[in-house]
Amino acid sequence: MNVSDFHFDLPDELIARYPLKERSASRLLSLDGLSGQTTHLKFTDLPDLLQPGDLLVFNNTRVIPARLFGQKETGGKVEILVERLLGEKELLAHTRSSKSPKEGQRLLLEDGAALRMLARKDALFHFVYEGDEAFLDVLERIGHMPLPPYMEREDEQSDRERYQTVYAKEAGAVAAPTAGLHFDDVVLSALKAKGIEFAYVTLHVGAGTFQPVRVDKIEDHVMHSEIAHVPEETVKAVNEARARGGRVVAVGTTSVRSLESASRAGRLQEFRGDTDIFIYPGYRFQTVDAMITNFHLPESTLIMLVSAFAGYNNIMSAYREAVEQKYRFFSYGDAMFLTAQEPSRGMMLGTDSAEPHQTESRGESQ
């Protein structure tokens, strides 16, 4: 397929640049992957779409204030976007300045903290923080929330709360797992009251999620790599859901990619490592039966993923309908509930055979 097959026209006014006052006040477009039928709902209607015994799998990554501003010792301005923390003192980052930093060069941050460049790794720069505290503490003090470029605004104090899920726990993402932004205590309580089970994965969303696809054929795209962890207790929760006839419902594409990365030929196992899994039409899902997701950018890898899940024609038709109905798009926008166009290969497996492993998997090879 061509990347252009995933284009759709989106009026600028439908891009949500700020969140609604209440997290769960968003709209919810339900799409049946088998029939293609759509239903227009509110996000607070989500419990009505689920059955007791279903399992919701959330991504509990926490967005770090990853954008920094500083200057070189020569006085030139520099902007830094942390891509990945490497322990307490070291990091990989993107930089923006008139000239790229050189090995050994120091960058001075807003409060006098300093980074020294150790090496360049492709498009990223490897830095070490020269202070005594953990660099994450520096980010919390002077960093800015890394809002997506399409918001076309500077971050505000309120983004520290709203560009973060209420269940965020593991620090490391530079973009929010946005499907989770709709959940508040009211919705979570209603889900628990209905007998819906919860489980968690961690995928630290990288800045690569905002990079455009620069090839014509989707098969030629090389996916960026991100750190993911599917713990043994989540594998157990999935197996128990299967045993009682419940569905595995992934909250967001990051949860989908985590679970599918941890599935080997239909076998879900504990997973910890890097994943560059790229899911597009033709991929056979191993574990996920339904998903909650936001509306994604035209020609992005994420609209390719949801097309693989609920059907290309179904998704493109639903997106056109969402535009007509003036749904709000992207990170701070509205949500979709998708069921699969065909059953996953999920099956009941015991956790005694689960073992940690690292893979770098591509969707087309599964």
Swiss-Prot record:
GO terms for biological process: queuosine biosynthetic process; tRNA wobble guanine modification. Pathway: tRNA modification; tRNA-queuosine biosynthesis. Residues 354-366 have a biased composition (Basic and acidic residues). Its main location: cytoplasm. Its EC number is 2.4.99.17. It holds the Pfam family Queuosine_synth. It catalyses: 7-aminomethyl-7-carbaguanosine(34) in tRNA + S-adenosyl-L-methionine = epoxyqueuosine(34) in tRNA + adenine + L-methionine + 2 H(+). Keywords: Cytoplasm, Queuosine biosynthesis, S-adenosyl-L-methionine, Transferase. It is found in: Cytoplasm. GO terms for molecular function: S-adenosylmethionine:tRNA ribosyltransferase-isomerase activity. One of its GO terms (cellular component) is cytoplasm. Residues 347-366 are annotated as: Disordered. Belongs to the QueA family. Monomer. Transfers and isomerizes the ribose moiety from AdoMet to the 7-aminomethyl group of 7-deazaguanine (preQ1-tRNA) to give epoxyqueuosine (oQ-tRNA). This is S-adenosylmethionine:tRNA ribosyltransferase-isomerase. It comes from Marinobacter nauticus (strain ATCC 700491 / DSM 11845 / VT8) (Marinobacter aquaeolei). The lineage of its organism: Bacteria, Pseudomonadati, Pseudomonadota, Gammaproteobacteria, Pseudomonadales.
